[in-house]
Each structure stands twice: as structure tokens, then as C-alpha cells.
């Protein structure tokens, strides 16, 4: 068994007001903590330490080129306004609950997650990055190489456990986080959103940027697209049922079809974020029929939306 010692905060913040926002602190590479009261955790699991509101504030989003097949973040002012409106509607229903984005590698979870977190006023975390910082290694690929996939998965579960005790977060999970039932236990404390991207689009994105940072796809030789598509197809078959456990499925093919596109690469991350908010709102409304909000709250929300 891989040996390792993790540290975790004994107390974690659970709700964060706008007046007491504080930056998070994460463990350094040599098992040193920068803040907080610490305890030694069980062997072989290096735990992410998270305090207060989460990660560093996300920088303002601007239209720009993207290496993932998306040309811009916002196509127009109208799109940005729609994003803001949908986020305000969803915020009412979320009541501080976290959002966990799941999906295959290259599906845009981090890009879309940053957009969603900024407009919601939430903090954003990439679970892979938290594992890297907790273990003290620069990449997931190196963790796989030096330790093992199982070692990485143990730490990934520990990170998700720590995050699940918090509120007002958007979390981009690793592509394989869904394969462990315990991770669903943690993610079900919030709302899970599956970004469902066609395999062809995923393979094109990954072939374009390379596979060195993706240990499950990295191959010594062969056509990048063909190799990526073959491996992604195998992973999709293994994980398909697990992804379907998500509360919400956001199909990029469906979004593209509604917009009259024949290629999902024509969608912007903002398109995907807007659809995600729409699906989240529908899901929460459907699942709160037996526990509706009070009349005064509903009236207040209706008046607020009408003024937008």
C-alpha cells in the first residue's frame, strides 16, 4: 500500500456571508499546513484542507480564444445578461448548496464551472488541483506514475469528503470520480451536473492539446485523435451508468440542436452554463413540490424576477 500522511482541518466553515469572505488555505507539498488547527489523518490518504470560502477569486471573464474548441466565452451582451438572469433565478433555489460538475475528461467542467461560480458568487474548486496540492505533486499524471491510480482515487475521495461539508461551491470533479460510490455520497449533499459531450468532440479537443496531462489516455505512439477516441470510447462504456447518477444531464448535442448548430464546438462555455442553470432550476423545482417555499418567499422571488 502506498504510504502517506494527510492533514485535515478539525473545523470547517459551512456557510459564508458576503461580509466575511476569506481565502482558503491548502496544504503544501511536504505535509505542511499554512493555517488552521490540524490533526493527523489515516495513512495513504492525503486530505485537502479547505477553510472559509474556498479558492482564490476567479478572475473576471472576457471573450477570448479557447484551446478546447470554444471560440469565445460570451457571444454577445445578450448572452451575458441571460446568464446573469438565470443564475439569479437558480440562486434562490440552491439555498447555498454546492454544485458538482461531472463528465469525461475534456468536457469543459473547469471552464464552465468558473463561469457558473463567478456569476453565482460561489467559490470554484477543481478537485484534481486539490489532490495535487494535498499530495505535493504538480500533476495527476505524476501521481499516477509515482504512486498509482488507486492512491489518487483515495485522495480524490478525501478531497470530495472535505468539500461536501461546505456550502456555496462549484466543484469540477475528475473524470473518474464517478466510479466510486462513496463519492456520490459526498456529491449528493449538493447538486450534481453531468456535462455530456459527444466522444468525437472530446477526442478532437484532447488530440489538439495533447494527452501528456491525462494519464489514462497518454500513448507513446499513434494518431492522437484515433488513440484518444478509442480510449474515450472504452472509458465511456465503463462509466456511462455512473455519469447517469447525476441529478442533471446537460447534453451539448441538445443545446447545439436547439441553436441550429451541427457541431457542439460552436457552443460557448456560457451557452453550456446557461443550460446547466436551466436544468438545475427545473430539477430543484420538481423535487421541492412536496416541500414548497412559503408564499411570502415565492411572491418576493416573482417580484424580483419581474424587475430584471
UniProtKB/Swiss-Prot annotation:
Cofactor details (free text): Binds 1 Mg(2+) ion per subunit.
Predominant location category: plastid
Residues that bind ATP: 103-110, 214
Enzyme class: transferase
Positions contributing to substrate binding: 128, 153, 175
Obligatory cofactor(s): Mg(2+)
Keywords: Amino-acid biosynthesis, Aromatic amino acid biosynthesis, ATP-binding, Chloroplast, Kinase, Magnesium, Metal-binding, Nucleotide-binding, Plastid, Transferase, Transit peptide
GO molecular function: ATP binding; metal ion binding; shikimate kinase activity
Pathway(s) it belongs to: Metabolic intermediate biosynthesis; chorismate biosynthesis; chorismate from D-erythrose 4-phosphate and phosphoenolpyruvate: step 5/7
Tissue specificity remark: Expressed in panicles.
Residue stretch of the organelle transit peptide: 1-62
Subcellular location: Plastid, Chloroplast
Binding site residues for Mg(2+): 110
UniProt EC number: 2.7.1.71
Induction profile: By chitin oligosaccharide elicitor.
GO cellular component, one term: chloroplast
A GO biological process held by the record: aromatic amino acid family biosynthetic process
InterPro entries per the UniProt record, alphabetical: P-loop_NTPase, Shikimate/glucono_kinase, Shikimate_kinase/TSH1, Shikimate_kinase_CS
Catalytic activity line of the entry: shikimate + ATP = 3-phosphoshikimate + ADP + H(+)
Function: Catalyzes the specific phosphorylation of the 3-hydroxyl group of shikimic acid using ATP as a cosubstrate.
Family: Belongs to the shikimate kinase family.
Protein name: Shikimate kinase 1, chloroplastic
Native organism: Oryza sativa subsp. japonica
Amino acid at each position: 500500500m502506498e504510504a502517506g500522511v494527510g492533514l485535515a482541518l478539525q473545523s470547517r466553515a459551512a456557510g459564508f456571508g458576503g461580509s466575511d469572505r476569506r481565502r482558503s488555505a491548502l496544504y503544501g507539498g511536504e505535509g505542511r499546513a499554512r493555517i488552521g488547527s490540524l490533526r493527523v489523518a489515516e495513512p495513504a490518504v492525503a486530505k485537502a484542507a479547505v477553510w472559509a470560502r474556498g479558492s482564490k477569486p476567479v478572475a473576471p471573464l472576457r471573450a477570448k480564444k479557447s484551446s478546447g474548441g470554444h471560440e469565445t466565452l460570451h457571444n454577445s451582451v445578450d448572452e451575458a445578461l441571460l446568464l446573469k438572469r438565470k443564475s439569479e433565478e437558480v440562486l434562490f433555489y440552491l439555498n447555498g448548496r454546492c454544485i458538482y460538475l461531472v463528465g469525461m475528461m475534456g468536457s469543459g467542467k473547469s471552464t464552465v464551472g468558473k463561469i457558473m461560480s463567478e456569476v453565482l458568487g460561489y467559490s470554484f474548486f477543481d478537485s484534481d488541483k486539490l489532490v495535487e496540492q494535498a499530495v505535493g505533486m504538480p500533476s495527476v499524471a505524476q501521481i499516477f506514475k509515482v504512486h498509482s491510480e488507486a492512491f489518487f482515487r483515495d485522495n480524490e475521495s478525501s478531497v470530495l469528503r472535505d468539500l461536501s461539508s461546505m456550502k456555496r461551491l462549484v466543484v469540477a470533479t475528475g473524470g473518474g470520480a464517478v466510479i466510486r460510490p462513496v463519492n456520490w455520497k459526498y456529491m449528493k449533499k449538493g447538486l450534481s451536473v453531468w456535462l455530456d459531450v459527444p466522444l468525437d468532440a472530446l477526442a478532437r479537443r484532447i488530440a489538439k492539446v495533447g494527452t501528456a496531462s491525462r494519464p489514462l489516455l497518454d500513448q507513446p505512439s499513434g494518431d492522437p485523435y484515433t488513440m484518444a477516441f478509442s480510449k474515450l470510447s472504452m472509458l465511456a462504456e465503463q462509466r456511462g451508468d455512473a455519469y447517469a447518477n447525476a441529478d442533471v444531464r446537460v447534453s451539448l448535442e441538445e443545446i447545439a440542436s436547439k441553436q441550429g448548430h451541427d457541431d457542439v464546438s460552436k457552443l460557448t462555455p456560457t451557452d453550456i452554463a446557461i443550460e446547466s442553470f436551466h436544468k438545475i432550476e427545473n430539477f430543484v423545482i420538481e423535487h421541492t413540490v412536496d416541500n414548497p417555499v412559503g408564499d411570502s418567499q415565492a411572491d418576493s422571488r416573482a417580484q424580483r424576477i419581474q424587475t430584471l
